[in-house]
Amino acid sequence: FNLPSDIGMMIVDSYDQESIDSMVSQTKCVLTTVGPYQLYGEKIITSCISSGTDYVDLCGEPGFMHKIISEYSEEAKQKGSRIVFSCGFDSIPFDLGVLFVQEEVKAKFNKYAPSVRGRVRDMNGEFSGGTAASMKATMAALHSNPDLINVLINPHALCEGFQGVRQDEDSKPKYDEAVSYTHLTLPTTNS
Protein backbone atom coordinates (compact mmCIF):
# COMPACT_ATOMS: atom_id res chain seq x y z
CA PHE A 1 0.00 0.00 0.00
CA ASN A 2 1.15 3.54 -0.67
CA LEU A 3 -0.03 5.08 2.58
CA PRO A 4 1.64 8.19 3.94
CA SER A 5 4.13 7.32 6.67
CA ASP A 6 2.01 9.00 9.35
CA ILE A 7 -0.93 6.65 8.68
CA GLY A 8 -0.56 3.32 10.39
CA MET A 9 -1.87 0.04 9.07
CA MET A 10 -3.03 -2.87 11.21
CA ILE A 11 -3.68 -6.41 10.07
CA VAL A 12 -6.43 -8.04 12.09
CA ASP A 13 -7.77 -11.59 12.25
CA SER A 14 -11.56 -11.22 12.07
CA TYR A 15 -11.98 -14.47 14.01
CA ASP A 16 -9.84 -13.24 16.93
CA GLN A 17 -11.86 -10.96 19.23
CA GLU A 18 -8.75 -9.86 21.15
CA SER A 19 -7.09 -8.80 17.89
CA ILE A 20 -10.24 -6.92 16.85
CA ASP A 21 -10.57 -5.16 20.22
CA SER A 22 -6.91 -4.14 20.16
CA MET A 23 -7.27 -2.61 16.70
CA VAL A 24 -10.54 -0.85 17.51
CA SER A 25 -9.12 0.66 20.71
CA GLN A 26 -6.32 2.31 18.68
CA THR A 27 -8.48 4.12 16.15
CA LYS A 28 -11.31 6.62 15.77
CA CYS A 29 -12.92 4.90 12.78
CA VAL A 30 -12.78 1.39 11.35
CA LEU A 31 -13.20 1.05 7.59
CA THR A 32 -13.81 -2.52 6.50
CA THR A 33 -14.10 -3.44 2.85
CA VAL A 34 -14.40 -7.22 2.76
CA GLY A 35 -17.46 -9.33 3.51
CA PRO A 36 -19.51 -11.29 3.87
CA TYR A 37 -20.31 -8.92 6.71
CA GLN A 38 -22.90 -11.33 8.09
CA LEU A 39 -20.02 -13.73 8.75
CA TYR A 40 -17.28 -11.29 9.81
CA GLY A 41 -18.88 -7.95 10.66
CA GLU A 42 -20.77 -8.30 13.92
CA LYS A 43 -17.68 -8.83 16.11
CA ILE A 44 -16.08 -5.73 14.65
CA ILE A 45 -19.24 -3.65 15.06
CA THR A 46 -19.81 -4.70 18.67
CA SER A 47 -16.18 -3.88 19.46
CA CYS A 48 -16.58 -0.46 17.82
CA ILE A 49 -19.75 0.20 19.81
CA SER A 50 -18.12 -0.85 23.09
CA SER A 51 -15.29 1.62 22.58
CA GLY A 52 -17.31 4.42 20.94
CA THR A 53 -15.40 3.98 17.67
CA ASP A 54 -17.05 4.78 14.33
CA TYR A 55 -17.54 2.03 11.73
CA VAL A 56 -17.85 2.26 7.92
CA ASP A 57 -18.27 -0.59 5.42
CA LEU A 58 -19.22 -1.50 1.86
CA CYS A 59 -22.00 -3.85 2.97
CA GLY A 60 -24.74 -4.73 0.51
CA GLU A 61 -26.36 -7.32 2.81
CA PRO A 62 -29.76 -5.99 3.97
CA GLY A 63 -30.37 -8.89 6.35
CA PHE A 64 -27.13 -8.17 8.20
CA MET A 65 -27.75 -4.43 8.29
CA HIS A 66 -31.28 -4.99 9.62
CA LYS A 67 -29.97 -7.27 12.38
CA ILE A 68 -27.31 -4.77 13.45
CA ILE A 69 -29.72 -1.82 13.42
CA SER A 70 -32.35 -3.78 15.36
CA GLU A 71 -29.96 -5.15 17.97
CA TYR A 72 -27.34 -2.43 18.41
CA SER A 73 -28.71 0.94 17.30
CA GLU A 74 -29.61 2.25 20.76
CA GLU A 75 -26.35 1.12 22.33
CA ALA A 76 -24.36 2.68 19.49
CA LYS A 77 -26.16 6.00 20.04
CA GLN A 78 -25.47 5.86 23.79
CA LYS A 79 -21.77 5.13 23.24
CA GLY A 80 -21.38 7.74 20.48
CA SER A 81 -20.45 5.15 17.87
CA ARG A 82 -21.65 5.92 14.34
CA ILE A 83 -22.32 2.86 12.17
CA VAL A 84 -22.35 3.65 8.43
CA PHE A 85 -23.22 0.84 6.02
CA SER A 86 -23.05 0.59 2.23
CA CYS A 87 -20.47 3.20 1.27
CA GLY A 88 -19.89 1.53 -2.07
CA PHE A 89 -21.09 1.42 -5.67
CA ASP A 90 -24.82 1.55 -5.03
CA SER A 91 -24.64 4.49 -2.65
CA ILE A 92 -22.13 6.75 -4.34
CA PRO A 93 -23.89 7.66 -7.59
CA PHE A 94 -27.42 7.46 -6.26
CA ASP A 95 -27.43 8.62 -2.64
CA LEU A 96 -24.92 11.40 -3.24
CA GLY A 97 -26.41 12.14 -6.65
CA VAL A 98 -29.87 12.60 -5.16
CA LEU A 99 -28.45 14.77 -2.38
CA PHE A 100 -26.70 16.99 -4.95
CA VAL A 101 -29.79 17.22 -7.19
CA GLN A 102 -32.08 18.04 -4.26
CA GLU A 103 -29.72 20.75 -2.97
CA GLU A 104 -29.63 22.34 -6.44
CA VAL A 105 -33.41 22.08 -6.90
CA LYS A 106 -34.04 23.56 -3.44
CA ALA A 107 -31.64 26.46 -4.14
CA LYS A 108 -33.28 27.24 -7.48
CA PHE A 109 -36.99 26.57 -6.74
CA ASN A 110 -37.11 26.86 -2.93
CA LYS A 111 -38.54 23.35 -2.61
CA TYR A 112 -37.35 19.80 -3.13
CA ALA A 113 -38.19 17.65 -6.14
CA PRO A 114 -40.94 15.13 -5.28
CA SER A 115 -38.87 12.33 -6.84
CA VAL A 116 -35.53 11.74 -8.50
CA ARG A 117 -34.70 8.93 -10.90
CA GLY A 118 -31.25 7.54 -11.54
CA ARG A 119 -30.14 5.26 -14.34
CA VAL A 120 -26.99 3.30 -15.12
CA ARG A 121 -26.90 2.91 -18.90
CA ASP A 122 -23.92 0.67 -19.27
CA MET A 123 -21.88 -1.25 -16.80
CA ASN A 124 -19.07 -3.73 -17.19
CA GLY A 125 -17.88 -6.13 -14.56
CA GLU A 126 -18.85 -9.21 -12.69
CA PHE A 127 -19.52 -10.36 -9.17
CA SER A 128 -16.46 -10.31 -6.95
CA GLY A 129 -15.58 -13.26 -4.76
CA GLY A 130 -16.86 -11.27 -1.78
CA THR A 131 -20.21 -10.61 -3.45
CA ALA A 132 -20.58 -14.28 -4.36
CA ALA A 133 -19.68 -15.27 -0.78
CA SER A 134 -22.22 -12.76 0.55
CA MET A 135 -24.92 -14.24 -1.68
CA LYS A 136 -24.03 -17.74 -0.46
CA ALA A 137 -24.11 -16.59 3.18
CA THR A 138 -27.51 -14.96 2.60
CA MET A 139 -28.88 -18.21 1.16
CA ALA A 140 -27.60 -20.07 4.24
CA ALA A 141 -29.16 -17.43 6.52
CA LEU A 142 -32.51 -17.81 4.70
CA HIS A 143 -32.32 -21.56 5.17
CA SER A 144 -31.90 -21.20 8.94
CA ASN A 145 -34.30 -18.23 9.24
CA PRO A 146 -37.01 -18.26 6.54
CA ASP A 147 -38.58 -15.07 8.00
CA LEU A 148 -35.51 -13.17 6.77
CA ILE A 149 -37.19 -13.05 3.35
CA ASN A 150 -39.52 -10.35 4.75
CA VAL A 151 -36.51 -8.11 5.33
CA LEU A 152 -34.96 -8.88 1.95
CA ILE A 153 -38.07 -8.09 -0.10
CA ASN A 154 -38.89 -4.87 1.77
CA PRO A 155 -36.90 -1.94 0.32
CA HIS A 156 -37.67 0.06 3.48
CA ALA A 157 -36.76 -2.64 6.03
CA LEU A 158 -33.80 -0.62 7.29
CA CYS A 159 -35.97 2.44 8.05
CA GLU A 160 -38.49 1.25 10.63
CA GLY A 161 -41.87 2.92 10.15
CA PHE A 162 -40.91 4.53 6.82
CA GLN A 163 -42.66 3.35 3.69
CA GLY A 164 -41.32 5.89 1.21
CA VAL A 165 -42.66 6.34 -2.28
CA ARG A 166 -44.56 3.58 -4.00
CA GLN A 167 -42.28 0.89 -5.40
CA ASP A 168 -42.74 -0.97 -8.66
CA GLU A 169 -44.77 -4.12 -8.16
CA ASP A 170 -42.55 -6.27 -10.35
CA SER A 171 -39.14 -6.41 -11.94
CA LYS A 172 -40.22 -6.47 -15.58
CA PRO A 173 -38.37 -4.21 -18.02
CA LYS A 174 -40.02 -0.81 -18.44
CA TYR A 175 -39.59 1.88 -21.06
CA ASP A 176 -38.73 5.32 -19.65
CA GLU A 177 -39.79 8.04 -22.09
CA ALA A 178 -37.76 10.69 -20.26
CA VAL A 179 -34.51 9.02 -21.31
CA SER A 180 -35.77 6.92 -24.25
CA TYR A 181 -34.45 3.78 -22.63
CA THR A 182 -35.75 0.46 -21.35
CA HIS A 183 -34.63 -0.34 -17.81
CA LEU A 184 -34.89 -2.83 -14.99
CA THR A 185 -35.36 -1.67 -11.42
CA LEU A 186 -32.78 -2.69 -8.85
CA PRO A 187 -34.93 -4.64 -6.37
CA THR A 188 -33.68 -2.76 -3.31
CA THR A 189 -34.17 0.78 -4.66
CA ASN A 190 -36.89 3.04 -5.95
CA SER A 191 -37.70 2.93 -9.64
Locate the predicted segments by residue.
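Conserved Rossmann-fold cofactor-binding substructure of NAD(P)-dependent oxidoreductases
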Residues: S14-Q26
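ADP-ribose/adenylate-binding Rossmann-like module
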Residues: C48-G63
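Rossmann-fold NAD(P)-binding glycine/threonine-rich loop
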Residues: G60-K79
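N-terminal Rossmann-like NAD(P) cofactor-binding module of classical short-chain dehydrogenase/reductase
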Residues: T27-T32, V56
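Rossmann-fold cofactor-recognition segment
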Residues: L3-S14
